[in-house]
Amino acid sequence: VEMSKVLGQPVVVVNKAGAGGTMGATEVANAAKDGHTMGMLPVGPMTTQPNLRTLPYGPDSFDYVCLVYSNPQLLLVRADAPYKTYGELVAHAKQNPGKLNYGSSGIGSVPHLAVVALAKAANIDVFHVPHKGEADALASILGGHITMFVSHPTFMTAHADKIRALFVLAPNRLP
């Protein structure tokens, strides 16, 4: 509503999930360059995905306006999970190799690669379950279909009674 008032025309918001954010980025890149299409793109489709596959867009496909937000990522588990710390999760994974899984917003997304790095550092075997987007991965962890999920603090605060953060992937501790 506020954007409509400022711009003097209707604003339609379309959430386009899929392929780690590249579906939405492709749609924005292919839109007419008439100033009527804006994209709020996460970091993955702009930095990670171009290094993993050939995409129908590149850095020059967009006119960049601003950085809207920057937030840390959290390693989330269900509130009723048997582990209360990352160390306990690692110990559980080592005792049950290949039994733990994790969701992400897509192959090559920041959450996917974050868990790959964590698993490699801890020398544990976990199974990746890619989702269409973060909302789908959140539904999977809330439903007990995945063991863990890396996401931003918004999901944690909105579902604090159902999920728990084991640690923050950021240079500083969160308040």
Residue ranges and their predicted role:
Residues M23-K33, V116-A121, A135-H145, T154-K162:
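Short helices/loops that flank or line small-molecule/ion binding pockets
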Residues V1-V12:
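Signal peptide-proximal N-terminal region
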Residues P10-T26:
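Early extracytoplasmic/lumenal segment of secretory-pathway proteins
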Residues N15, M40, S104, R164-L169:
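Structural signature of the Rossmann-like NAD(P)-dependent dehydrogenase/reductase core
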Residues M3-K5, N30-H36, V43, P50-D136, ...:
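Hinge/capping helix and adjacent helix->loop/strand transition within the periplasmic-binding protein
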Residues G35-L41, T147-S151, A165-F167:
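Paired acidic/hydrophobic, glycine-rich loop segments that form the ligand-binding mouth/hinge
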Residues L55-P59, G144-S151:
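Short gly/ser/thr-rich secondary-structure transition/capping motifs
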Residues M156, P171-P175:
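Short, intrinsically disordered, charge-balanced linker/junction segments flanking boundaries
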